[in-house]
Each structure stands twice: as C-alpha cells, then as structure tokens.
Amino acid sequence: MPAQGADAGVAWHYGEPVAEQRALEAGRAVVDQSHLGLVTVKGPDRLTWLNSLSSQELASLAPGVSTEFMILNPQGRIEHVASAVDDGETVWLITETAAGLAAHLDRMRFMLRVEVADVTADWAAIGEPVSSPAAGRVSWVDPWPRIADGGTTYAPADGIAPALRSWRLVLVPRADLVSEIESRIGAGAVLAGTWATEALRIAAHRPRAATEVDETSLPHELDWLRTAVHLHKGCYRGQETVAKVHNVGRPPRRLTLLHLDGSGADLPSPGAVVTLDGSDAPAGRVTSVSRHHELGPIALAVLKRSTDPSATLMVVGDDGPVAATQEIIVNADGFSADRPPKPGPTTKGLLLGKGCAADGGDM
C-alpha cells in the first residue's frame, strides 16, 4: 500500500505491518527510502564553508563519520535539516527539502571553491536497521539519541529514555535501486514500509523535518540539540538565538510523545489539535502518528511548554476526541541538562544583541 503525506512515493506497508515492524526492530528488514532528497557539495572548501553556514561543527568532519545539521534563519528558526556524511571528496546531504537547500547553498557560494548539486534524480537511499557504515558504500548512520560532541538534551533526568533503534541510509545509483533491494531480500531481509519506520521513529522520540518542523520551530523545542547543534562552534546565522535560549531556557513549546487511547479503530491525523481534558483551548498539535506493534497507537505532538506534564490530554480526531497521556521528551521547565548556572561573558554579549555577525551583530 502506498504511503501518503511526507512519505508519498514509497510504500506504507506490504500487507503485514506488524511483522514488518518486528523485522525492522530485529535488524532484518530493508526499506525503500527513495523519496528522500540528496544534495552533494564538492570542492576543497566544502567542509569549512558548510561549517560557517550551519549549526553543526563540520570543519573537521572525517570521511565516513555521520552527523546532521540545520540551516537556521536569523531568528534561530529551522529552515533546513540535513543528514551529512563526507566520503573524502564530496559531502552527501540527505534532506527532505533538497531543492530549497540546494538553492540556498548555491546562493551562498560567493568566491569559494565549492560545487552544489541536487542529485535526487540520480541517487536514492535504502534504509536498513544497522548501526555501522556500509563497507564500500556511502552511508549515513543515524546518531540519535546519542548526545553528540557540543550537544545537549532537554530530556528530564528521571524521564523515560528514548527507545534505541539502529538505522542507516545507504546511497545507491537510482538506476540500481530495485536490484539493490532485491539483493538484500535474497540475503534474508524482509521488505518493510514506512509504517514500520515511523512507528519506531516516534517511539525513539526522533524528530523529523517534514513532520515536526514548522515555520516557528526552534531546535530546543524538539530536543534536537542532541545531534544537530554544536553549542561551542564559531559563528553562523541564528546562533545568537540558539545561545540565548540555551542560557536563559524556556523555549515556547516542547515535543512530547503521546500514548493514545486505542479503543477506537482510527488514529488522529497529523495536524490534529491537542487540548487539555475538559478544555476547548488548543494546547498544541499532533505532528506524527502511528500504531506501534507493542506500544499501540502513539504520536508525537508539539505542545505549549506550560502544558501540565501530568495532565490527560484530548486529541481532536475526525471521529471525536481521543484521550492521551504524555511521555515527556522536552522538559516542561525548558532547561537543558547543561544549562549554565549564570550568564558568562559570551552570553552577556549575545543577550545584548552583540554576538554573531551572521545575525547582524558586531562580532
């Protein structure tokens, strides 16, 4: 059955969604991820250039090491998210906004020795439940939920840890996509759809650009400082807001996992309004939803940070309200695990608007 929405273009499932999830969780599945976009950046200045534009430390990225980064606007809102791996000559970027990202990067080349190309038409990604790089292939291994160097988390210290999952994307010529998948099936892999990948992603608290990000999203709200933001690197656009929210705390919203009442047959749709039980006032919205083979119906939702973490919520579905309880991903107090005890010299400058030149400051 074909997927819809953000996963349109590949299969939602192949007739046995529960078995497909179990196979994926057990490490013996293969997933068509050819709907994802691919952008390449070549040239001797590629790493230092991307480092200057993005939220991640990329200047010293070693070949074969997987990371991810964001392109932020001057207010620190998320514009693009990319998974990145360098093969020694080319940085490969896997993204859900390939055309927009490639256009933005191309505008920022100036006189630097870099070449940007959207290669989505020629290359495709295959998903596998593996936590190590593919030998002899360009592959990206998901770093989530490990806290990368320079990162931090907004998860509560006594909260439920994200479910562990192994996941990598192997890049192949698009002309070879079918034969590459068939070879894996011949070796014993089970073909799984995006129902399986989404269920395991949601259970892992893993945000996704196509679903959790909107025009006002801050990285802190989604716990994305784990893997996509380096707090101690040099200047980039949006850095002042990143530093300010990290130091002061209290981002406006927070990502949470919802355990939905499973008594109904249908699940709410992404975009469904979330309210407090007994209230009509919106507290947030559902961003991703799936039926997990063990946890049942689950969803990710972005809520107002002030929403009581212990409150029972109601999700306004097409067939009526659905009760939901919260599994906290981002602390309701809005403070990260390593929030500085008091502002230091750098923070003072940032708070006065005198920080990063890319944000219009006078650094």
Predicted feature locations:
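Acidic, low-complexity central loop/insert segments
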Residues: 30, 38, 80-207
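Glycine-centered loop/turn motifs
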Residues: 63-65, 142-150, 205, 210, ...
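Anionic-ligand-binding alpha/beta catalytic cores of soluble enzymes and soluble regulatory domains
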Residues: 171-259
